């Protein structure tokens, strides 16, 4: 697996660009904003975006989801349906927290615990992890020993992913 971590927005939330080395297909996980910058990284990596994966509906994790999906013509997968409240509030969250361009979206696929998502030939198990938000999900791969956890776990702090 190839991976790029891209801190975005004033929150410095980590958006992940996950690339399958076998197919060169990619997904953004939690594109919170700074969409032009995200596409620059994608272009530099020479990968083809196939989808957007979303862990939860807070502005710093999904403020750029609608724009990324529209610009690339790719589907949105996740989060869990219990996040619809937060996603419906994205326009307001963007105004409150100064994230321009943030707007609501409708996932092409809502996710549930036990579902599977793919990026190229790579497979990730979806785990529903309510707590930070009701519909928070994570994407875990035992094959690669990695999990994209959104705001379920923090390394060395209580708020910087």
PLM feature spans:
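Residue-level signal for pocket-adjacent positions within structured domains
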Residues: 1, 82, 106, 112, ...
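Conserved beta-strand hairpin/beta-sheet module of binuclear metal-dependent hydrolase folds
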Residues: 1-45, 138-150, 155
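Generic preference for hydrophobic
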Residues: 3-5, 29, 52, 76, ...
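Short Gly/Pro-enriched turn/cap motifs at secondary-structure boundaries
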Residues: 6-8, 99-100, 106-108, 128-130
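Short, basic and Ser/Thr-rich N-terminal targeting/leader segments
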Residues: 11-12, 104, 120, 133
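Divalent metal-coordination and catalytic microenvironments
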Residues: 18, 30, 56, 68, ...
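Active-site HxH/HxHxD metal-binding segment of metal-dependent hydrolases
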Residues: 23-26, 34-122
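Metallo-beta-lactamase
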Residues: 92-93, 116, 122-161
């Amino acid at each position: 697996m190839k991976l790029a971590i891209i801190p975005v927005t004033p929150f410095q939330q980590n958006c992940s660009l996950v690339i399958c080395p076998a197919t060169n297909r990619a997904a953004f996980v939690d594109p919170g904003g700074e969409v032009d910058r995200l596409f620059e990284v994608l272009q530099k990596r020479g990968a083809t975006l196939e989808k957007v994966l979303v862990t939860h509906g807070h502005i710093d994790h999904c403020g750029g989801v609608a724009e990324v999906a529209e610009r690339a013509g790719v589907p949105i997968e996740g989060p869990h349906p219990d996040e619809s409240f937060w996603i419906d509030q994205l326009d307001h969250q963007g105004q409150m927290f100064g994230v321009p361009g943030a707007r609501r979206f409708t996932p092409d696929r809502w996710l549930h615990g036990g579902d599977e998502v793919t990026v190229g030939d790579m497979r990730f198990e979806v785990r529903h992890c309510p707590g930070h938000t009701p519909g928070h999900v994570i994407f875990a791969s035992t094959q690669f020993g990695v999990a994209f956890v959104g705001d379920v776990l923090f390394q060395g702090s209580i708020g910087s992913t």
